[in-house]
Amino acid sequence: VNIDLNQVFHLHNTVDAPITVVYKKMHHRDISDVNAILEIDETDHVTGQRLFDGTDADALYNMSTDIFIVDTPWLIEKLEAEIHKEHPEKLRYILRDLAVEHGAFAFEYTGYIANIHSVESYYRANLDMLETNKFMSLFSPNQKVYTKVKNEEPTYYAPGSQIKNSQFASGSIVEALVHDSIISRRVHLHQRAEIRSSLLFPGVVVHEGAVVEHAILDKGVVVETGVTVRGTKEAPLVIKKGAVITEDIG
């Protein structure tokens, strides 16, 4: 999520509630059982909450992002009261309860958000970045994301390489077919290798004729010549850091 909090601050200052919570309407497959689902009235105030139970698979749920705007003196007062309890709660749960108790203003976020709670959701969130509208929503020019800079040489694409709908970091050598994938730095993809719908971390080497499909290869993984590594869209295969794969998997 990449939200402009200035807008949330502005709306928070116009309502009488001491707490504002940001929520997003989400499909059931994008929510886990640790997420809070909000009950919101017609005036956009929170009236209740519950943990997600997935009882209605077709519904959109008001999932709390656990992003809160609160009045500072009010929050300090509530936290001081909490620490004197025999079993004080963690801050996340305190804020969730306060949102219901004090009728928090509910701010609906309509941009891109990925709720990562499993290998499959992590895999899907990364591949979402291959869709232009989702990429631009997360990395908006008006709401910059600053990352650690690595000044390396550009990735080299050999004449025989075939690239479709993929993203590449710098410093790699690509001689292979790469479709619908995200390739990190210093990766070497040899001739006649095929990479489809996969995430390759830094330093991965895929040798000649190998096939990687619906997989997540951690740092330094080596896939030997002619080997197939294949998961599925629903259950991507994860190869641990530094592994050398000499036999077919999947």
Language-model segments: residues:
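Left-handed beta-helix
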Residues: 73, 81-250
